A protein has these predicted regions:
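Transmembrane helix-loop junctions in multipass membrane proteins, especially transporters and channels
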Residues: 25-33, 91-98, 124, 150-154
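Functional transmembrane core segments of multi-pass inner-membrane proteins
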Residues: 8, 100, 106, 111-177
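Functional transmembrane helices that embed catalytic/metal-coordinating motifs
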Residues: 11-20, 61, 126, 177
Length: 177
């Protein structure tokens, strides 16, 4: 296994772990930055070695270290899924219709994987899509369209079609609220 593959796998699993924190804490209106992870039942504060993505769940046999209550299998599944999508993004071919730099394409792929997994989980668990993720996804998508237009000898039609598609799509979700 190449070192970059291992690095991207670990990065993806770590981002997946953050997605788990995001999904859990945003629904409870808690900070996603401050505060340590705790067992939801006994409030035991997890040590750093209990927070290693994927690995800790298996080492703890899917149970809290203190009270032995089951920890949902969803945690390592989300971490593995995110790691898998990051690896897929790493080895996918860059977009075929532009000379966009490879690093930008990869970075955008990682960000979009994060947004798609987060929104999918929010929708599955709470039937709710947080505006701070959907709106930032919209801005990132439009920024990408603008950059692709610039790298495609500034084909303004491409950017305008992306802008109109974003407007129609976002309007659809606003109407559904």
């Amino acid at each position: 296994m190449e070192l970059k593959t291992l690095f991207i796998f670990i990065l993806g699993a770590s981002i997946g772990s953050f997605i788990n924190v995001l999904i859990y804490r945003v629904s409870l209106k808690k900070s996603i930055v401050f505060g340590s992870s705790k067992c939801p039942k006994c409030e035991y504060q997890l040590a750093w070695f209990d927070n290693i993505p994927i690995l800790s769940w298996f080492l703890l046999l899917g149970k809290c270290r203190k009270c032995k209550v089951n920890i949902s299998i969803n945690y390592p599944i989300v971490e593995l899924l995110t790691a898998f999508l990051f690896i897929l993004n790493l080895y996918s071919k860059p977009t075929f219709y532009t000379d966009t730099p490879l690093l930008w394409s990869r970075l955008l792929g990682f960000i979009l994987a994060f947004i798609c997994i987060s929104l999918s989980l929010f929708d599955l668990r709470y039937f709710w899509l947080p505006n701070f993720i959907t709106f930032n996804g919209l801005l990132i998508g439009l920024s990408n369209s603008l950059l692709l237009s610039i790298y495609s000898n500034f084909d303004l039609k491409f950017f305008l079609s992306s802008l109109s598609a974003a407007f129609i799509g976002y309007s659809f979700f606003l109407i559904l609220r």
